[in-house]
């Protein structure tokens, strides 16, 4: 399979999935008076966030054999294989599929196996967004942009897409790591967008690429 067909398969299968948003689930941490005293506008994923009335703690986790790190909600767990096969039925599923207890809020991470440079992140995003919109006209891009995180160019796109149970909000981002393209994707029901948009961006901004040292 050539590189273009491989990328097309990943994108087509991901956007063709049937999601079941449901209510956002979370594990409530014990509120502390000191934490409650932090003004809402000053709360971040590093202080803990109150989302839909529940305190959510975040922690840094490592992925892709320790090559990539990112802050993730503590209650996110690996999606079980049965659910992953239903939601992401393609043969080449994302290496990382994390979800909340209800399966409504998800984070995915994929090595696209495409050779790129640090300057190509926006090109990869634009090409894949074109593919996605061509096969799914229901996709509604909301914004695109680029942030420099560490020394990496990280290109992102926000969009919504319809599902059988309602619309999903997606924050998808692309970057180079060890010469290959990585794609991260956060999604949640649009009805939960006001709670999750800020932490979704903070999660993206927390990413770290750990370059492996070559020992001669």
Language model feature labels by segment:
Residues 1-108, 113-119, 127, 131-140, ...:
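N-terminal targeting sequences that direct proteins away from the cytosol to non-cytosolic compartments
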């Amino acid at each position: 399979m050539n590189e273009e067909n491989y990328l097309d398969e990943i994108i087509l299968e991901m956007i063709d999935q049937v999601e079941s948003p449901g209510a956002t689930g979370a594990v409530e941490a014990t509120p502390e008076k000191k934490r409650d005293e932090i003004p809402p506008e000053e709360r971040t994923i590093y202080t803990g966030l109150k989302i839909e009335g529940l305190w959510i703690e975040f922690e840094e986790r490592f992925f892709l054999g320790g090559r990539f790190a990112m802050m993730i909600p503590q209650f996110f767990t690996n999606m079980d294989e049965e659910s992953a096969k239903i939601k992401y039925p393609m043969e080449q599923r994302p290496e990382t599929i994390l979800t909340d207890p209800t399966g409504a809020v998800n984070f995915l991470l994929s090595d696209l196996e495409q050779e790129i440079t640090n300057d190509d992140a926006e090109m990869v995003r634009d090409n894949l967004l074109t593919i996605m919109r061509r096969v799914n006209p229901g996709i509604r891009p909301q914004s695109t942009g680029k942030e420099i995180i560490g020394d990496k160019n990280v290109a992102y796109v926000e969009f919504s897409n319809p599902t059988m149970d309602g619309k999903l909000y997606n924050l998808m981002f692309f970057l180079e790591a060890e010469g290959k393209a990585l794609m991260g994707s956060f999604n949640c029901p649009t009805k939960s967008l006001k709670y999750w948009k800020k932490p979704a961006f903070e999660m993206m901004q927390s990413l770290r690429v750990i370059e492996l040292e070559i020992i001669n």
